[in-house]
């Protein structure tokens, strides 16, 4: 936001008018990852589409300001990022790889040891199949793929923790627009 890293949920729409805003979608070209986003995928730090786009923005901003940041500068830049899916070492590797690729786009670094030559994926450094979508903040979760004609389950719980049900009339619920099926204790399939 106007050259500063800001948590988007702390802004209101009126503040955004005529502002310079960079989002994860603005980092790369159409269907192409930016240098930092690609380094994140290659290192294997991408685990969640929630924090990773923010991390890509923060690291891009850091590398725009400081060509080869120290660990202290990296720690300071990432201090506002709460990530439980990855360790800091991987972010240091992302920055090391991105800095190296500024001069040599084919540069690689030792990321992690590999094990078991007889296996192709297990014990190998292998990026997540949806990592590129995640780091670009593109739809990649089941919730992102809900079709317009999908059924949504709604649960109505009893206000009583323990109760003996003697009668249950679901006719009003069944008459509601859009209701496909009402399941109760009387017609619930036994699956075990």
Predicted regions and their residues:
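Flexible, low-hydrophobicity surface segments
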Residues: 99-192
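Signature of N-terminal electron-transfer/Fe-S-associated modules in redox systems
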Residues: 1-112, 121
């Amino acid at each position: 936001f106007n050259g500063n890293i800001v948590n988007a949920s702390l802004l209101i729409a009126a503040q955004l008018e005529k502002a310079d805003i960079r989002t994860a979608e603005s980092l790369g070209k159409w269907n192409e990852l930016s240098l930092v986003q690609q380094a994140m995928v290659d290192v294997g730090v991408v685990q969640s589409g929630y924090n990773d786009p923010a991390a890509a923005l923060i690291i891009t901003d850091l590398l725009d300001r400081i060509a080869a940041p120290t660990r202290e500068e990296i720690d300071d830049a990432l201090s506002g990022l709460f990530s439980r899916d990855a360790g800091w070492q991987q972010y240091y590797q992302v920055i090391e790889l991105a800095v190296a690729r500024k001069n040599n786009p084919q540069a690689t670094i030792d990321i992690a040891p590999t094990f078991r030559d007889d296996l192709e994926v297990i014990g190998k450094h292998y990026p997540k199949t949806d990592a590129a979508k995640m780091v670009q903040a593109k739809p990649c979760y089941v919730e992102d793929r809900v079709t317009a004609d999908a059924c949504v389950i709604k649960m109505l719980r009893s206000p009583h923790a323990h109760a003996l049900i003697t009668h249950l009339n679901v006719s009003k619920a069944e008459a509601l627009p859009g209701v496909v099926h009402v399941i109760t204790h009387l017609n619930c399939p036994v699956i075990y």
